[in-house]
């Protein structure tokens, strides 16, 4: 390991970002002082400000760093797929599995991200809004394009639920499951394995977005999808 005093500027930035994730997750954005961030990173406040002129810029860099993990690599692969009912199934499974299981994406990184998100929502939601601004626009657009493709192929049963809200509702179902499963003793005993819980939640969500039962049966293979990451 390099001597801390001899780290390059880029290595120093990366080290600071890695060091402060847990602090932000524990105390939130507003509850964290620059002194605490500097102490966690093992640098002075002056050096911290040299690399990150504000807490907001450090927050943004932390989010960018999180976007380099396995989950976001899969996210980008999914966005490259052609819009279709099959893509819709993959998208819903990915979201639910990421929140309910998470093991494929790295438990430590996932735990920090989830804690950051929950803490953010209990405060001013700045971290969550930043994440949405950077990642959800393309995702929601792909989701809507896939709904249109499924409808054109006769694989979607139209409902009164607006198409531009359906991707959000899928996310909220998955996020709520994650919160209830987060404690060491889950808040709800679903009496099924996590694999089966994912499958059931995905089927529920796919019905909600409008896919027909025969379409779900045709494209949804949870065992195969679990091997994609």
Predicted regions and their residues:
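Hydrophobic/aromatic residues within well-ordered alpha-helical segments
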Residues: 55, 62, 66, 92-95, ...
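A short secondary-structure junction motif
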Residues: 65-73, 120, 124, 146, ...
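Helix-turn-helix
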Residues: 15, 23-65
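Hydrophobic/aromatic-rich alpha-helical bundle segments in the mid-to-C-terminal region
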Residues: 4, 107-110, 114, 128-138, ...
């Amino acid at each position: 390991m390099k001597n801390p005093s001899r780290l390059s500027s880029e290595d120093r930035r990366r080290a600071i970002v890695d060091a402060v994730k847990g602090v932000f997750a524990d105390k939130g954005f507003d509850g964290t002082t620059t002194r605490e961030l500097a102490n966690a990173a093992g640098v002075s406040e002056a050096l911290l400000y040299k690399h990150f002129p504000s807490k907001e810029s450090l927050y943004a860099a932390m989010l960018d760093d999180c976007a380099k993990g396995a989950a976001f690599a899969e996210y980008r692969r999914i966005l490259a797929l052609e819009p279709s009912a099959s893509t819709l199934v993959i998208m819903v499974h990915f979201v639910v599995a990421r929140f309910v299981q998470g093991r494929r994406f790295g438990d430590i990184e996932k735990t920090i991200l989830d804690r950051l998100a929950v803490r953010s929502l209990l405060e001013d939601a700045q971290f969550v809004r930043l994440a949405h601004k950077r990642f959800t626009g393309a995702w929601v657009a792909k989701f809507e394009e896939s709904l249109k493709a499924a409808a054109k192929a006769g694989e979607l049963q139209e409902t009164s639920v607006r198409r531009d809200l359906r991707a959000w509702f899928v996310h909220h179902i998955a996020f709520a499951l994650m919160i209830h499963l987060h404690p060491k003793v889950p808040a709800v005993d679903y009496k099924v394995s996590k694999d089966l819980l994912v499958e059931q939640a995905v089927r529920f969500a796919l019905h909600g977005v409008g896919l027909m039962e025969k379409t779900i049966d045709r494209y949804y293979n949870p065992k195969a999808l679990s091997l994609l990451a």
